[in-house]
């Protein structure tokens, strides 16, 4: 299991790469491995406002449909439209296959370091 140290994480298994007042968001390696092969990604619209901790998109795998929670508050600035045609990219390269870019970010204080997130994953595996 891979936990890049330069990223931040959530307990609901999203990764966050903060770049100034913007952030890229994706699903962690653990999330994609638990979901199985992804077959569909339902992305939000650019310009949508999101609230930290609330559902803002969903993904479907061969196992189930799953909600994805916004790790931060802000405004959707960009969505990764490549995932609409290639949702399996998340399984292949979870830390490259970002879902959205959020601008005007807020509510960073609940994000976890790689070490904190690894402890969350290890406790879920037990």
UniProtKB/Swiss-Prot annotation:
Coiled coil: none annotated. The modification N6-lipoyllysine is found at residue 63. The keyword Iron-sulfur does not apply. Binds 1 lipoyl cofactor covalently. Keywords: Lipoyl. Its cofactor is (R)-lipoate. Residues 22-103 form the Lipoyl-binding domain. Pfam families: GCV_H (PF01597). InterPro entries: 2-oxoA_DH_lipoyl-BS, Biotin_lipoyl, GCV_H, GCV_H/Fam206, GCV_H_sub, Single_hybrid_motif. The glycine cleavage system catalyzes the degradation of glycine. The H protein shuttles the methylamine group of glycine from the P protein to the T protein. Belongs to the GcvH family. This is Glycine cleavage system H protein.
């Amino acid at each position: 299991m891979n936990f890049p140290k330069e990223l931040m994480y959530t307990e609901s298994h999203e990764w966050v790469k903060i770049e100034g007042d913007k952030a890229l968001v994706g699903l962690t390696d653990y999330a994609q491995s638990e979901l199985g092969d992804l077959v569909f990604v339902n992305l939000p619209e650019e310009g949508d406002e999101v609230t930290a901790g609330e559902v803002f998109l969903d993904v479907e795998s061969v196992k189930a449909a799953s909600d994805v929670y916004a790790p931060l508050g802000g405004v959707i600035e960009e969505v990764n439209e490549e995932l609409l045609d290639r949702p399996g990219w998340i399984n292949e390269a979870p830390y490259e296959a970002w879902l959205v870019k959020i601008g005007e970010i807020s509510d960073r204080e609940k994000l976890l370091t790689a070490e904190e997130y690894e402890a969350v994953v290890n406790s879920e595996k037990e």
